[in-house]
Curated annotation (Swiss-Prot):
Protein name in UniProt: Crossover junction endodeoxyribonuclease RuvC
Coiled coil: none
Similarity-based family: Belongs to the RuvC family.
Catalytic activity: Endonucleolytic cleavage at a junction such as a reciprocal single-stranded crossover between two homologous DNA duplexes (Holliday junction)
GO cellular component, one term: Holliday junction resolvase complex
UniProt-listed PROSITE patterns: RUVC
Documented EC number(s): 3.1.21.10
Species of provenance: Neisseria meningitidis serogroup C / serotype 2a (strain ATCC 700532 / DSM 15464 / FAM18)
Binding locations of Mg(2+) 1: D11, D143
Primary gene name: ruvC
Note describing how the cofactor binds: Binds 2 Mg(2+) ion per subunit.
Length: 178
């Protein structure tokens, strides 16, 4: 019987940070918890960062994940938005590493590819697949579903069949191991 691994997935945002926690046992994935960390929109950036750090710390303390995964920042058309998103992501990373969690990072494209099967999937498709993959009775909020999708991506890439077929962690580029 294989051991259970608990994974925390984070979808960082300066206004709403989504999180999802799953347990992985062999090839099976089990829903544990998910939610959204909402920051006061009128608060100074430093206060919003503090909210993200504090709440992620509370989630880690309550659910005790063994691994974490965070979605990487994409470059937005608006540089100020990209910068704020990067700061929220930095807050999430700081909170996770302060709890000594190993952290992996995935692009939105990698998350959509792993969960939906295509990198250009819509948010609704991600939500639908999260519900299907975890056997949920309802649809989580979009940001929470994204957090769960990040956790599932980490599970599929590091604990699934792909990881067993490629134990050295090599990447495939143009059909060849690199």
């Amino acid at each position: 019987m294989s051991a259970t691994v608990r994974i925390l997935g984070i979808d960082p945002g300066s206004r709403v940070t989504g999180f999802g926690i799953i347990d992985v046992r062999g090839r099976d994935h089990f829903y544990v918890a998910s939610g959204c960390i909402k920051t006061p929109p009128d608060a100074p950036l430093a206060d919003r960062i503090a909210v993200i750090v504090r709440h992620i710390g509370e989630v880690v303390a309550v659910y005790k994940p063994q691994q974490a995964a965070v979605e990487q920042v994409f470059v937005n058309v608006n540089p100020a938005s990209t910068l704020m998103l990067g700061q929220a992501r930095g807050a999430a990373l700081a909170a996770l590493v302060s709890h000594k969690l190993p952290v992996s990072e995935y692009t939105a494209l990698q998350v959509k590819q792993a969960v939906v099967g295509k990198g250009k999937a819509a948010k609704e498709q991600v939500q639908h697949m999260v519900v299907q993959m975890l056997g949920l009775s309802g649809t989580p909020q979009a940001d929470a579903a994204d957090g769960l999708a990040v956790a599932l991506t980490h599970a599929l890439r590091n604990h699934g069949l792909a990881a067993k077929l490629n134990p050295s962690g090599m990447q495939v580029k143009r059909g060849r191991f690199q």
